[in-house]
Regions:
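Beta-strand/loop substructures that line and gate deep hydrophobic ligand-binding cavities in soluble
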Residues: 81-134, 150-151
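Short, surface-exposed charged micro-motifs
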Residues: 8, 39-40, 68, 94-96
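Hydrophobic beta-strand positions in extracellular immunoglobulin-like domains
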Residues: 11, 56, 71, 111-113
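Glycine-rich portal/gate segments that line the openings of hydrophobic small-molecule binding cavities
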Residues: 29, 39-86, 134-151
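Hydrophobic ligand-binding cavity/cleft-lining segments
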Residues: 1-47, 134, 149-151
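Short strand-connecting beta-turns/loops that link adjacent beta-strands
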Residues: 14, 45-47, 74, 100-104
Length: 151
């Protein structure tokens, strides 16, 4: 069954900084708790990650999945679709970066997911919460720290 979640957060960093953190997939293991390994398999004409394999912690084990990134709506939106995954049938989503008047950014994260194995509702909700925590809260911490350092 497809599950969809959307969450927004204000980040005290400009949109360029937030976007750069999201685009720098090779550094995800530095700040995204559950991401253990990243391999960029293909870049687009502008040098941005286009096809990326991830190894992540999930359900007490390791999972591997490959995402195809779409930058056609950049700089405001970065989106991705699952190419293949061992525990997921669908893992599609997007980030949007909306500059605010005070220099901050409203970051929206949307995810559509379907697992390949059945799980109880409470486990799915816990997993969604953990993904959102990493996708937004840990991105916020990383972007704000980078912004404070002038990056």
């Amino acid at each position: 069954m497809l599950e969809q979640v959307t969450e927004r957060m204000i980040v005290r960093a400009n949109a360029d900084c937030c976007r750069e953190v999201a685009l720098d997939v090779e550094r995800y293991p530095d700040w995204a708790t559950d991401i253990k390994e990243v391999e960029v398999l293909a870049l687009d004409a502008e040098g941005r990650a286009e096809r990326v394999r991830f190894r992540a912690a999930a359900f007490g084990r390791s999972t591997t999945y490959t995402l195809l990134y779409d930058h056609s709506a950049a700089p405001g939106t970065i989106s991705w679709k699952l190419e293949e995954g061992d525990l997921t049938r669908v893992l599609d989503g997007w980030y949007t970066f909306e500059p605010l008047d005070d220099g901050d950014t409203e970051v929206t994260y949307h995810l559509v997911a379907e697992l390949a194995l059945p799980l109880p509702g409470f486990v799915k909700r816990r997993t969604e919460g953990r993904i959102m925590h990493t996708a937004l809260r840990e991105l916020k911490v990383r972007a704000e720290a980078s912004s404070a350092l002038g990056g």
